[in-house]
């Protein structure tokens, strides 16, 4: 799908996507702030300083196309995919559905296409939906992670709620306890908040700090002639004063990709790869550092696990027009609608359609290599105590198992957490300080999903 939308309409839509009110932090957000806070103290240790230096170097190499990191596409094509991914299809996960494969991706996108409609004499974009049930599930999950992402950006940029209003004493204590200071990236990379060429709030982005930034042009999501600079400095999107950490696009990309994985479990591993690609594409654009992407991934995965566990403060909360009391049941209801819609469009059982794939996600060896490279982006160990020690997921974050059981019902929660423990990535990263939140930075849902699928009793009988 390609749409041609007037620049005025596009700017308005970008405003809708990027601007939302930031409220005072809630009780559920304090653990999120605490979990992401280790970045603020990286300059206090030699290991942390080395990680900061590597973060800039890795980011620059990926953005410039000089990295040895495997990608799903040749670099020029990956750049174009990154430009396409700059637009958030938050209403229906349309832009991420290509991870479902050739057949199912086309079927999903045919059911959720975008159209331009006239309302009150103005052109507006209408996002198609599988069903109201699916739309509600997506909106509720996105609202949860979006609120967390918005708060964390300002908190880690200048220690405020919205750029100006101070945070609570409890939130401030999070930084005090670890000797943390906001604007870590701005200060570390020579662009402290408010200085020439810097973000006015803090945590300037790579396009503001990299010694060499690669600008490129192409067609965006709407098929319009554009380029990465247009989505960094305007007019399509202006991120000059939008703080870097954590990546909001990555948070969205993982949340919606994982929702699609849960809705279509046959494509769970590939949807995790799609999420990883979406996050890595933010580095290619010059919008984010590797640490931003890792932070966004961890935030989305953590939030989704809390939703699936029906944790108080996550469910039964009003998000706009929607309120969900039982997220797992809402997911089950939505899956029934998605399955019917996809089978109707594809013309075959969903398992057969899932296997019909000629997309960039069809090569498992390529998926393996690329996804593995994004687990840590090669950043060095910061927390030596957790580096060589597997984290006990069941003990630290037992709700994480729902990320598997919600898709693969033959698993018990204990079995799911055992798989997550066995497949977790390397430890000791900049978020892996031994906390419950930190363990989410180690989860390897790609390998975990593969093991879960292999454990299907129906497969074992064949």
At which residue positions do the language-model features occur?
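Bacterial N-terminal signal peptides that target proteins for export
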Residues: 1-11
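N-terminal signal peptide c-region/cleavage motif recognized by signal peptidases
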Residues: 19-21
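Hydrophobic alpha-helical bundle signature of multipass membrane enzymes
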Residues: 25-284, 313, 322-326, 333, ...
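Extended amphipathic alpha-helical segments with heptad-repeat/coiled-coil character used for oligomerization
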Residues: 244, 287-350
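Extended ligand-binding clefts on enzyme/binding-domain cores
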Residues: 343-362, 366-371
């Amino acid at each position: 799908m390609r749409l041609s939308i007037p620049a005025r309409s596009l700017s308005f839509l970008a405003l809708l996507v990027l601007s939302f009110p930031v409220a005072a932090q809630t009780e559920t957000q304090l653990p999120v702030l605490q979990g992401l806070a280790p970045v603020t103290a990286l300059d206090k240790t030699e290991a942390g300083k080395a990680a900061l230096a590597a973060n800039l170097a890795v980011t620059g190499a990926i953005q410039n196309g000089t990295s040895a990191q495997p990608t799903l596409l040749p670099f020029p094509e990956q750049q174009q995919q990154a430009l396409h991914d700059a637009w958030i299809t938050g209403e229906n996960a349309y832009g991420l559905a290509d991870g479902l494969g050739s057949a199912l991706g086309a079927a999903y996108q045919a059911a959720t296409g975008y159209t331009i409609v006239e309302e009150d004499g103005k052109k507006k974009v209408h996002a198609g939906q599988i069903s109201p049930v699916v739309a509600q599930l997506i909106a509720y999950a996105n609202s949860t992670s979006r609120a967390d992402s918005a708060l964390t950006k300002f908190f880690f940029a200048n220690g405020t709620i919205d750029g100006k209003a101070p945070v609570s004493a409890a939130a401030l204590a999070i930084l005090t306890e670890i000797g943390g200071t906001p604007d870590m990236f701005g200060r570390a990379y020579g662009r402290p908040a408010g200085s020439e060429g810097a973000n006015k709030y803090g945590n300037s982005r790579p396009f503001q700090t990299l010694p060499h930034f690669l600008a490129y042009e192409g067609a965006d999501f709407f098929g319009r002639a554009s380029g990465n600079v247009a989505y960094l400095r305007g007019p399509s999107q202006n991120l000059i004063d939008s703080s870097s950490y954590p990546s909001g696009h990555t948070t969205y990309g993982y949340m919606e990709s994982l929702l699609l994985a849960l809705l279509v479990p046959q494509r769970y591993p590939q949807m995790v790869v799609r999420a990883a690609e979406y996050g890595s594409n933010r580095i290619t654009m010059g919008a984010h550092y590797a640490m931003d992407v890792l932070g966004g991934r961890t935030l989305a995965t953590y939030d989704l696990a809390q939703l699936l566990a029906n944790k108080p403060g996550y469910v039964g909360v009003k998000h706009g027009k929607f309120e969900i009391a039982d997220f797992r049941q809402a997911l089950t209801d939505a899956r029934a609608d998605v399955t019917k819609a996809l089978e109707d469009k594809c013309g075959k059982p969903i398992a057969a359609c899932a296997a019909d794939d000629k997309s960039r996600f069809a090569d498992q060896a390529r998926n393996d290599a690329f996804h593995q490279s994004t687990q840590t982006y090669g950043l060095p160990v910061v927390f030596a105590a957790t580096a060589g020690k597997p984290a006990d997921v069941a003990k630290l974050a037992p709700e994480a198992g729902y990320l598997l059981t919600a898709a693969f019902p033959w698993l018990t929660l204990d079995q799911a957490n055992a798989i997550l423990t066995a497949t977790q990535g390397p430890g000791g990263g900049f978020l892996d300080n031994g906390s419950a939140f930190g363990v989410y930075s180690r989860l390897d849902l790609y390998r975990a999903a593969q093991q879960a699928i292999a454990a299907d009793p129906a497969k074992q009988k064949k």
